[in-house]
Amino acid sequence: MKIIRNIARRPWPRIGGWLPVMMLICGVLASCSSEDESTAPLPDGKYPLQLTAEVAQPQTRAGGKDAWTGGEEIRVSLEGVFGNKTYVMDASGNASPKDADNAFYWKNTDEARVSAWTPDIESETDISDQSGGYAAFDVLYASAIGRYDQAINLRFIHRMAKIEVILKAGEGITEEELEGATVTIFGDPLTHSTAGLVSPGDQSDGEIKPYYDAATKKYEALVPPQDMTGKPLIRISIGSNDFTYTLSLIHI
């Protein structure tokens, strides 16, 4: 009886070791098979990158960019492909390559990230005078993941922080006095932008002349995100009086 029990138990360590090995091999084979099925090379120049685009955060930016009017150029990058290319928007929100040299084509069937930005500013920009508008540096950025067999929709967001000031009469100040008021925004008057990412220039605080929207009676200015904690943010000059606003905690 003792011999029979030993014989009965003896195969199980071998079988128990065999099954996990077999399952591991099957798992590896399944993974390889799945990868082969999901990623396959595509013929060169056959599947162009298809793009549509919209501007998110549709708050009014009279001096900036809220919608496509046609002709705007956006810079585009495709994950896995070296370099950036230029696409041109139409008024319907469709993007097409600027020319044949600026066309992206899918290399395989795998998903990839598409990033885009406009305007393409690669140097330090002076933003101290925005009285004529700020569209030239109203940086928009978008990113999305897609495949070769579908159009990719890009939702552009504004990268710069926007400051709005509305003046109202009251407490001894008349509408006539407000018409002659001067509004000054404090902050870094320089900005850097690279591939849709913005940052302050030299970090020095300066004065920015805002854009005035007569229709909404708003003073508007764009600034790169920066820490203004404990620093003056807005100065309003009415006649010989200056009113300065400083917020204790603010990161714009």
What residues fall within each predicted segment?
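Sec-dependent N-terminal signal peptides
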Residues: R10-M22
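Sec-type signal peptide cleavage vicinity
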Residues: K2-I3, G17, I25-L249
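N-terminal secretory signal peptides that target proteins for export/translocation
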Residues: M1-P13
